[in-house]
Design a protein with these regions (language model features):
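Hydrophobic alpha-helical transmembrane segments of multi-pass integral membrane proteins
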Residues: 37-61, 177-200
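Membrane-embedded alpha-helical segments of transport systems
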Residues: 51-56, 77-93, 111-118, 147, ...
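Single conserved hydrophobic/aromatic residue that forms the stacking wall/gate
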Residues: 1-7, 303, 308
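Membrane-interfacial segments at transmembrane helix termini in multi-pass membrane proteins
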Residues: 238, 263, 267-273, 283-287, ...
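Membrane-embedded helical hairpins/re-entrant loop segments and their flanking transmembrane helices
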Residues: 19-47, 61, 66-67, 199-204
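Membrane-interfacial helix-loop connectors
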Residues: 49, 61-83, 91-113, 188-226, ...
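Helix-loop-helix hairpins and the membrane-proximal interhelical loops
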Residues: 4-38, 140-182, 186
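Alpha-helical transmembrane segments of multi-pass membrane proteins, especially transporters
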Residues: 25, 33, 37, 45, ...
Length: 308
């Protein structure tokens, strides 16, 4: 834990101070243009997080900018909200790893085909190109290929568990809102990645026994768990840097409390018929995206931010 804390702090300080020295006023002016309205900030946060596939990493970068004085807290809030939406894109990308084609277009889009093609292109860019930009693109493509292959392997390993009574009982236990939320928070805090937890849920869904009632509370807790590395990175930051991390946590806590109270209160009255619906990887990705977009909309509507 101490190593992780020191690493997060080092990344934050080196990145923020280094960018300020290299780019100076130009980067500061660029950041202002891209975040001078809340909508622009949300769009920037969504775009950046979609590329790097980590809301925590995006927020750590933002904390570095705020800590070095290149960005004001008011500008950072929009990016943080957008990061919560952008991280849900990974779930949709992972859906590709569950395409099991036997012929035609489905076979072309299968995990094995996509992973192989992407890996080959990545290796060529990594080995043959001299420019660092091309090499970095190659690294991204290799990482994507490994991610797809890993998800397919994990799904294959989890699939036989559907016949295990112990595994079935465990998933049923997650339908308890409190237990499910705590599992989502704890699991994401350990993995330090909301996308990884969503990926694990998608892998569990291939067993055919993961229901909406078990998946929903876990998804609710994912955002709060993802705040752990962000809070760690804020240790040693100045006042505004710490407040930036706190905004991230407050937004996710607000979404967790708001939607859990509304959903389970209404369910107690009307008894939703989809609670026992079997979840698929696409359904998990959709649930995660809808929850995050709804949270951002609710936060924007209530203007839940720290005073600047």
């Amino acid at each position: 834990k101490e190593y992780r804390r020191q690493r997060q702090m080092c990344i934050r300080d080196r990145m923020g101070d280094g960018l300020k020295m290299v780019a100076g006023n130009k980067l500061e002016a660029f950041l202002y243009r891209m975040t001078n309205t809340p909508l622009k900030g949300v769009a920037l946060g969504t775009g950046v997080t979609s590329v790097i596939q980590s809301s925590s990493a995006t927020t750590v970068m933002v904390i570095g900018f705020v800590n070095s004085g290149m960005m004001k807290l008011k500008q950072a809030i929009g990016i943080i909200m957008g990061a919560n939406i952008g991280t849900s894109i990974t779930g949709w990308i992972l859906c590709l790893s569950y395409i099991d084609g036997k012929n035609g277009i489905a076979k072309i889009l299968s995990t094995a085909t996509i992973s192989a093609v992407v890996a080959i292109i990545g290796i060529i860019l990594r080995m043959a190109c001299k420019r660092s930009v091309h090499k970095n693109i190659g690294n991204i493509m290799l990482g994507f290929a490994i991610l797809m292959t890993g998800m397919q392997t994990m799904s294959g390993a989890v699939s036989p568990l559907k016949d295990s009574p112990t595994f079935t009982n465990m998933l049923t236990m997650f339908s308890n809102p409190l237990i499910g939320i705590l599992v989502g928070i704890a699991f994401t805090a350990v993995l330090q990645s909301a996308s990884a937890t969503v990926g694990v849920l998608q892998a569990l869904s291939v067993t055919g026994i993961l229901t909406f009632s078990s998946a929903f509370p876990i998804v609710l807790g994912i955002g709060v768990g993802a705040a752990c590395p962000v809070l760690i990175s804020a240790i040693g930051a100045n006042k505004n840097g710490k407040r930036t991390a706190l905004v991230y946590l407050i937004n996710d806590l607000f979404g967790l409390i708001l939607w859990s109270v509304i959903f389970y209160t209404v369910n107690a009255v009307v008894h939703f018929g989809f609670m026992d619906m079997i979840m698929s990887p696409v359904a998990i990705a959709l649930l995660n995206t809808v929850f995050r977009v709804a949270t951002v909309c609710a936060v924007s509507y209530t203007h839940l931010t720290l005073p600047t």
